[in-house]
Design a protein with these regions (language model features):
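Phosphate-binding/catalytic loops
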Residues: 8, 96-153
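Short glycine-rich anion-binding loops that position phosphate/pyrophosphate groups of nucleotides
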Residues: 24, 93-96
Length: 153
């Protein structure tokens, strides 16, 4: 008897990718929140139009609320598994302007303030963290409340 190829009867989980310029802060936080809040029923990804390095204060801000993004790396949009992405969310204006047209994918823009820019004149990391925490919490609210609705419709 010939062996049959295994065919999954389960559709893949929907995927959401967050895009910003450097893939260092906001998009990384959003990916971390999605994986933390919705990993049972969604896949999370992030990328940048001009990737740099992971922002250490973004890592710290997420760690404060029990979300570990320390193993994340900055990636280019070309590295996204587009066959697994259903919704692409740009989280900064530059990424929105540079976002390529992706046939068959829903693309929305939800901008968030840039913590490194806001914290540029901070006198210490502790002072800078005030900006990172605010943006972190705004991203959490968006990911928790809006992303499931956006995927449905």
């Amino acid at each position: 008897m010939a062996a049959r190829a295994a065919i999954s009867v389960f559709p893949r989980m929907p995927g959401v990718a967050f895009l910003c310029t450097g893939n260092s802060c906001r998009s990384q936080m959003a990916e971390g929140w999605l994986r933390h809040l919705h990993s049972a029923h969604m896949q999370g990804f992030s990328a940048g139009t001009m990737p740099t390095t992971l922002n250490r204060l973004a890592v710290r801000a997420m760690a404060e609320v029990g979300v570990d993004i320390s193993g994340h790396t900055s990636k280019s949009i070309d590295a996204l598994p587009m066959d697994q992405v259903d919704l692409l969310v740009t989280v900064c204006g530059d990424a929105h302007d540079r976002c390529p047209i992706v046939p068959g994918k829903r693309v929305i823009h939800q901008g968030f303030d840039d913590p490194p820019l806001l914290a540029a004149n901070a006198g210490s990391d502790d002072e800078a963290m005030l900006h990172y925490r605010r943006v972190r919490d705004e991203i959490r609210e968006f990911v928790q409340k809006n992303v499931p609705v956006l995927l449905r419709g």
